[in-house]
Structures are given as C-alpha cells and as structure tokens.
C-alpha cells in the first residue's frame, strides 16, 4: 500500500497527540465576529492573518453560525481586550465547524475556537481562559517568532545535510535544532498561560478556570484515547508542556488574585447560550454513533467491534483498539464493472500476500478480502463495491493478524446500504441544556444521552464532573441528544 499503509502506521504513532493551541498556518469565505477596534495592528501581521485565514477556515470545516454563542464570545472577548495591555487591538473571532476540541490564533488578531471545544466549557470564565490564552499569543507575537525559529532550524538542518559528512554529526545537529524549536514552543505556551490568566483575572473572570479547564482537556484526551491512558510520557520534542506542568503553573498564576471560589460563577446563564449547539460530526461528513458509522448522503453504514473507537475525519474514518491496532475506512471511485477482487489485485497494496484474495459478499454487495505484510505490521484489507464506489477497510496490527482478521470479518458483515427512510431519519447530535429535577442523579441523566456507548463518561466530561461529584436540583446540565 504505497500511501494507505504508511499513513495508517503514522496515525498509530500520533494517536496520543492533542493540541489545544497552535500557531496555525493550515487550510471559504468568512465573516468573523469582530470586536470594534481603536487602532489596527501592524500591516505585516494583518497581511499574514488575511492570507492564512481562508485556509484555516477551510481546513476546519468552515464557519459555524450560532447567534447565541457568537454573542457570548463577543461579550467575553470585549472584556478581555479592555483588560489587556493593548486594548486598542482589533480581534476577529471565528467559530469553526469542527467537532475536535481546539483553539488557536493567527497574527493580526484572528482568534479561532471550535464548536467541539465550546461544548466542553461550562461557564464564561472557562471560555475566557481559552480566549485569553489565544489573545496572549497574539499580543506576544508568538506565531511570527516561532516561524523565525523554525526557519533558523531549517537552515541548521540544511547546513548539517550539505556540509557535515559524518552521519552522526548530521543527526546530532538536526536533533539540536528540533529540541530548540520544541523548547521555544513550550516556553511560548507557558508565557501565553501566564499572560492569559493575568488578563482574565483583571477582567473579572475566575483566574482558576484555566487550571480547571486544563483538567477537562486532559479528561477529553483520555476519553478520545483508545487506551484510556492519562500517563503519556513527556517527550523533549513535544511542543506543549505536560498537562500537570501547565496546571501547576496556572494555579500559581491564579493565586495572585486570591483564593479559589471567590469569583461568582455564571454556569446556568452561560449554558443557556450553548443550548442547541451541534455536537460531534458535521452531517455532510457522516455520523459516528458509538461504534457505528452512518453516512446519509452515501447511504452506507457499518460498525466496528469492541474495543475499537471510531473517529470521523474529512479524509477517512479511523478507529483504534490500543496503541498498535488500528483501522481506516475510505472510498475511491472505480468503474462500475470493477470487481472487488480485481481491485485488491490491481497493485495499490504493497506487501500483498500471494493467494490471499478471497471473494465474498457484504449483505448482498460484492466484496473481497486480502492479507498484506509490511515490515513488522500485519494487514487485513476488505473492499466492497457500491455502484461506482469502492469502499476500503484496512486493519493493521503490529503483533498478530488473528484479531484483525476477526475484526475485518465482523465489520464487513455489518456493512450495508441505508434505505432512503433510514437516511431521512438521521439527525445531527446537539447539546441540550436541561434543569436537574428532584430525584435526578448523574447516572439517570447520563442514561438519557444519545449517540454514544459511553454515556456516563461523556456526561461527566461535558459537565466538568469528577467521579464523586453529584448534581443538585435547579442546576443546569448538558445532554447530547438527537
């Protein structure tokens, strides 16, 4: 598999990564919510932001429109800007239509937050903690500074490659340059945390919300992880400090404003603005419902067995069952008379095991399976043709092919067409804010959640509740419902 297998192996290596803030330079039209300026920033920053903004918006699913949430954002940003050291800056805030929890900034005052991250916030102070961190990146010119450091590192690597004849010396020079970039990025994150907490505290928000929300993000990373591990080893090449380091530094900065619990909360009024927020996948990209994937436009569905966890992306549907086992599902156009077995034998699979192709069916649809080996990886591949589309299921495991053989068979057996009635009934998930009534418990409220097979975990995550926390009558909580 010239492209698919290396990509899948790379995805396994990156499965534990999560960014909460990046100086973005990635890929339309956008009309961001604006905070009225007194003075524009430098033209250089403005040009960079204007150039990169359309690519960022396109990469993250476009702009998500929600007047209630936009009003809440403008209110929070206005207070933060007024409390910053440069209240004359102009900021443009965009909600991105992405289910992934992320926020970042571009030079020129472009601030971005995904609807996936908004779903995790539980009061305006937590939202302020996110936005003040990104405002700090803008004020400190972090994106431009980091670009210069990366450029210098690239020069070092090129010199090492062109001038040094000793491979060990070349590798040492490259490693030193990468460590320099990583340490610089970590320092930027710590500085943005410190500046952001100072801004939020001066604006009257709870300064301890930053450490609280960092904990929520760590729980979010755990929830998304197939292994459920929160004990990721710290890499000296990581661009962010560890969550524990950031929480400790955030608490230290917050204590300058006093003790925790002295800032009035606004949970109930804030959650009212999130009522109706789309949660999870965009309808145009299909839906993940627990271990099931459904695409109303393509009229297909399939499910994966335990313990696989599905993730929908623009390029493919991915699943993982631990650090060394994964699945990728995608589709490619083919002539309508192409058989799945001929397609598997057409040369796109590197390491195809001779004689391993087997013809079969998937609920009446023509299908075929095959085996492949690449290095120390085992692969089981399935192909199903629906009209002029060939859908591919690629399972990979680093130790054995027995488990993935069974997983492929089960997934292939679940693949079928959706009827027009099935497709019409599919609706996106939304955040619904409800009042806790007498007799309600965490367990009873979580049981009402839809679209997930991990209801209790997701309910606690969305509402910022620990394992021992309870709910009280009169408070508001978030549910995920169709």
Model-derived features with residue positions:
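Primarily a LysM-type cell-wall glycan-binding module
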Residues: 420-453, 475
């Amino acid at each position: 598999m010239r492209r698919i297998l290396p990509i899948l192996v790379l995805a396994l290596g990156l499965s534990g990564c999560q960014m909460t803030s990046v100086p973005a330079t990635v890929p339309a039209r956008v009309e961001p919510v604006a905070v009225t300026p007194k003075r524009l920033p430098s033209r250089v920053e403005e040009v960079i932001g204007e150039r990169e903004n359309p690519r960022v918006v396109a990469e993250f699913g476009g702009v998500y429109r929600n007047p209630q949430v936009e009003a809440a954002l403008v209110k929070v940003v206005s207070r933060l800007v007024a409390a910053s050291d440069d209240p004359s800056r102009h900021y443009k805030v965009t909600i991105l239509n992405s289910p992934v929890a992320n926020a970042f900034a571009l030079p020129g005052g472009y601030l971005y937050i995904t609807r996936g991250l908004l779903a995790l916030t539980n009061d305006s102070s937590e939202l302020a903690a996110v936005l003040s961190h990104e405002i700090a990146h803008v004020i400190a010119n972090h994106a431009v500074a980091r670009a210069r450091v990366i450029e210098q590192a690239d020069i070092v690597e090129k010199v090492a490659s062109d001038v040094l004849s000793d491979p060990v010396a070349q590798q040492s020079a490259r490693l030193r340059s990468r460590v320099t970039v990583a340490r610089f990025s970590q320092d930027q994150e710590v500085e943005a945390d410190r500046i952001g907490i100072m801004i939020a505290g001066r604006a009257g928000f709870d300064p301890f919300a930053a450490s609280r929300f960092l904990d929520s993000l760590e729980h979010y990373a755990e929830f998304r992880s197939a292994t459920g591990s929160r004990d990721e080893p710290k890499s000296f090449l990581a661009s962010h400090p560890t969550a524990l380091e950031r929480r400790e530094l955030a608490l230290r900065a917050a204590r300058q404003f006093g003790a925790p619990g002295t800032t009035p909360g606004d949970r109930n009024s804030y959650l009212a603005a999130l009522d109706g927020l789309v949660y999870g996948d965009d309808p145009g990209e299909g839906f993940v419902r627990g271990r099931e994937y459904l695409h109303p436009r393509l009229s297909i569905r399939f499910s994966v067995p335990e313990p696989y966890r599905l993730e929908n992306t623009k390029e493919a549907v991915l699943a993982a069952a631990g650090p060394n086992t994964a699945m990728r599902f995608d589709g490619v156009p083919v002539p309508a008379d192409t058989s799945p077995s001929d397609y598997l034998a057409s040369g796109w699979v590197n390491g195809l095991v001779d004689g391993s192709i087997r013809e079969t069916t998937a609920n009446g649809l023509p299908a075929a399976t095959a085996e492949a080996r690449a290095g120390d990886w085992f692969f089981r591949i399935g192909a199903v043709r629906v009209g002029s589309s060939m859908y591919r299921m690629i399972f990979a495991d680093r130790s054995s092919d027995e488990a993935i053989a069974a997983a492929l068979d089960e997934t292939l057996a679940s693949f079928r067409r959706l009827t027009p009635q099935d497709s019409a009934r599919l609706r996106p998930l939304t955040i619904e804010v409800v009042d806790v009534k007498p007799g309600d418990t965490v367990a009873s409220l979580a049981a009402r959640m839809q679209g997930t097979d991990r209801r209790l975990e997701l309910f606690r995550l969305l509402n910022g509740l620990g394992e021992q926390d309870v709910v009280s009558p009169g408070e508001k909580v978030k549910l995920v419902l169709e």
